[in-house]
Amino acid sequence: MTSSGAAAGLGLLSAATWGGSDFAGGWGARRASSLLITASGQILSLAGLLVICLALRLTIPGASYLVYAAIGGFEGAIALAVFYRALAMGAMGLTAALTGLMTALVPVVFDLIHSGWPTAITMLGLAIGLAAIWLISHSPAKEGAESPRRALFLGACAGVGFGAQLILFKTAAAGGVLWALTSARIAGVVAILLVVAMAPPKRPWRGFWIAGVVSGTLDAVGNLFYMLASQMGRLDVAAVISSMYPAGTILLAGIILREHPTKRQVAGIGLALAAVALLSA
């Protein structure tokens, strides 16, 4: 298998596990605060990462790698809170699509500047992949927006934050993936706890930690796959394929909750498969 094929495969695994994480978090959010679920997942997965790193006696990387990871974890958690706020304001379908597109577009632009232009086939795959992300992420939710323009602005800001996190994670992973994940998770826990402290959850649910464990674990595994993918190939390829994670959420919702995807989302999934084939070449 070529390095591009391996990177694409790891990117797909990242998208699948991130999609599962979002599904678990979304399911739990029907019963408890999404921030409470996120906080519990971050804390519990951090404990697991610390145990693994210490048990394996992994060498702690240089401070710069840990700092990059911590910045990515902190600003990614803040971006998540901003994204939740944007969705709550309305224009949910368009906001989610814009966030997904910006998440992939930021590392694509960064890598084009930093690494130069890829082959024509890769460029075509990236373009199709970005279109797929837009279609997959767009949901038919009722708009009823409190402030559509502000919701879209916050959604775009969240997407930029998520995209920046992908860039930072690639840099941090060069020093050691597991310690990078741990550093990012520590900073993420701090950020989420700050957000929860400023806006205490109103819907406690004794079983929220179950959704938190599943969501947090899958999110950490998805981060692991993404970091590995980013080390084996171009950043833009890893970022675009990994950003197709809403497809995994949609498929799980269809299988478990019997929720049918829209024609737009089905078309997006088809384009995503075509994009992956091109990016694996």
Protein language model features and the residues they cover:
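Helix-loop junctions at the membrane-solvent interface of multi-pass transporters
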Residues: 17, 52-56, 112-117, 135-139, ...
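Hydrophobic/aromatic positions within or immediately flanking transmembrane alpha-helices
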Residues: 11, 35-39, 69, 93-97, ...
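Alpha-helical transmembrane segments of compact multi-pass small-molecule transporters, enriched
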Residues: 43-49, 98-112, 187-191, 222-226, ...
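Hydrophobic/small/kink-forming positions within alpha-helical transmembrane segments
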Residues: 15, 19, 23, 50, ...
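Hydrophobic/aromatic residues within transmembrane alpha-helices
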Residues: 28, 37, 86, 91, ...
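Membrane-interface interhelical linkers
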Residues: 1-17, 24-25, 29-71, 80-90, ...
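Selected transmembrane alpha-helices and immediately adjacent juxtamembrane segments
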Residues: 148-179
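Hydrophobic transmembrane alpha-helices of multi-pass small-molecule transport proteins
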Residues: 49, 105-109, 118-139, 264-281
